[in-house]
Amino acid sequence: MPTVNQLIRKPRQAQVKRNKVPALQENPQKRGVCTRVYTTTPRKPNSALRKVAKIRLTNGFEVIGYIPGEGHNLQEHSVVMIRGGRVKDLPGVRYHIIRGVLDTQGVKNRKQRRSKYGAKRPK
């Protein structure tokens, strides 16, 4: 623990808070156009084919977004909305595509957690 004199000579430095979603530029969501839709494999110890898309945002950033849920209709030139939120086992994926908004359809036959997947209430 420093003495009062040491603190006068060299004050405490505030910790720098790093922005985890810089491409959003302090906005809750951003719109973009898919430039490439593909699958990728997660880090160890997991194994799967995760669906992701490279997205060119309206502010010029190019980011990778995760496509949640089972099945999707995205292809090149699809207009999508992204939100923050990383995928822990996919390096470089720091954004999620929002289902049920713009060109992205909601998940079919989804009964629970429907709002997260843009699914309408079943009749």
Swiss-Prot record:
What is one GO cellular-component annotation here?
A: small ribosomal subunit
Instruction: Spell out the Pfam families in the cross-references.
Output: Ribosom_S12_S23
Instruction: Give coiled-coil spans as residue ranges.
Output: none
- Keywords, ordered alphabetically: Methylation, Ribonucleoprotein, Ribosomal protein, RNA-binding, rRNA-binding, tRNA-binding
Q: Which residues carry this modification: 3-methylthioaspartic acid?
A: 89
Q: Which CDD domains match?
A: Ribosomal_S12
Q: Which family does it belong to?
A: Belongs to the universal ribosomal protein uS12 family.
Alphabetized PANTHER family for the sequence: 30S RIBOSOMAL PROTEIN S12 FAMILY MEMBER
Q: How does this polypeptide assemble, per the annotation?
A: Part of the 30S ribosomal subunit. Contacts proteins S8 and S17. May interact with IF1 in the 30S initiation complex.
Protein task:
With S4 and S5 plays an important role in translational accuracy.
* Full protein name: Small ribosomal subunit protein uS12
What is the organism lineage in this UniProt record? Bacteria, Pseudomonadati, Pseudomonadota, Alphaproteobacteria, Hyphomicrobiales
